[in-house]
Regions:
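Amphipathic alpha-helical segments enriched in hydrophobic/aromatic residues interleaved with Lys/Arg
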Residues: 48-94, 99-100
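Append "Primarily bacterial transcriptional regulators
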Residues: 145-148, 152, 157, 161, ...
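N-terminal regulatory/effector-sensing and dimerization cores
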Residues: 1-51
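A short, Lys/Arg-enriched amphipathic alpha-helix from helix-turn-helix/homeodomain DNA-binding modules
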Residues: 112-150, 171-190
Length: 231
C-alpha cells in the first residue's frame, strides 16, 4: 500500500514494455474529516508522508482486513445516503488507518536487520557530522538532513528511529550533540559562547537553554568542579 498526503504527486514510469498498474484507490477530501475525531488525529498517521518506495507490504491476512474496510466504505457510498452514512464511512476509514499503523509496526519489526543497519549508518553519519566541522559549516543537525543522506523520507526515518531506540529522531540527535558538547565544555580555554557557535548554535542562549533542559544544569555549572553535576 502507498499513502499520499495532500498536495503530493505520484506517477508511474513503466520500464520496457507498457505496464498498466491496477488495484484499488481510496481518495477522500479533508472536508470529510474536518471537525471529527479522525480529523483531530490525522497527523498521527505519519505514513501519509512516506515516500512511495517505503510502501506497506501486506500479508494475505492483512490484505483481507484492508479489503473488508474498502468494501464497507464502498457499500456505504453506493447505497442510498442516510444520516448514518458519514459516521459509518468515517469509522471504517479510521479502522483502516489503525490497521495500517499496526501493520507498519509489524513491518518495522520483521525488517529489524534492515532497520538496525540504518541505525548504524545514521550513527556513523551523525558522528562524522559532529566531528568534522559540519556543525559550523551547515549548522545544527536536522532530521531531514540525515533522512536525505539515507534516502528516506523524514517521517519514515523518524518512525524507524523511534521503533529502534525508543526516542524520536530529534531527541536522539540532541542526545549525541550534548554528549559532544560535554567534551567541548571541559576545554576551559574556550568560553561557553565560543563553544555554542562551534556546535552550530546561532545564539549562545539557545545552547544554554537546551543544555540546562536536558542535562539539568547550565554549561558553566557543568564545567565548574564545585558542582556535582549529572553525567
Amino acid at each position: 500500500m502507498v499513502f499520499i498526503g495532500p498536495n503530493q504527486i505520484i506517477k508511474h514510469e513503466p520500464e520496457g514494455e507498457i505496464h498498466q498498474p491496477y488495484g484499488k484507490a481510496l481518495i477522500f477530501h479533508s472536508d470529510l474529516i474536518k471537525g471529527t475525531n479522525l480529523g483531530k488525529h490525522i497527523h498521527e498517521y505519519t505514513f501519509f508522508s512516506y515516500a512511495s518506495y517505503e510502501a506497506l507490504h501486506l500479508s494475505n491476512k492483512e490484505r483481507e482486513k484492508i479489503l473488508v474496510c474498502f468494501d464497507n466504505i464502498e457499500n456505504e457510498i453506493i447505497q442510498n445516503i442516510d444520516r448514518h452514512s458519514k459516521k459509518l464511512i468515517l469509522s471504517n476509514l479510521e479502522l483502516l488507518l489503525n490497521y495500517c499503523t499496526r501493520f507498519y509496526d509489524r513491518q518495522f519489526i520483521t525488517r529489524e536487520n534492515i532497520g538496525q543497519g540504518i541505525i548504524e549508518q545514521f550513527e556513523q553519519h551523525l558522528n562524522e557530522y559532529l566531528r568534522h566541522e559540519k556543525l559550523q559549516e551547515i549548522g545544527l543537525p536536522t532530521v531531514s538532513f540525515f533522512a536525505d543522506t539515507l534516502n528516506l523520507s523524514p517521517n519514515y526515518f523518524g518512525d524507524l528511529i523511534k521503533k529502534e531506540t525508543g526516542k524520536s529522531a530529534i531527541e536522539y540527535i540532541h542526545l549525541k550533540l550534548l554528549e559532544y558538547a560535554k567534551e567541548k565544555i571541559m576545554d576551559k580555554t574556550k568560553s561557553i559562547s565560543e563553544i555554542s557557535y562551534q556546535l552550530g548554535f546561532k545564539y549562545p542562549q539557545h545552547f544554554t537553554r537546551l543544555f540546562k533542559q536536558k542535562v539539568g544544569v547550565a554549561p558553566n555549572e557543568y564545567r565548574s568542579p564545585k558542582v556535582d553535576c549529572p553525567t
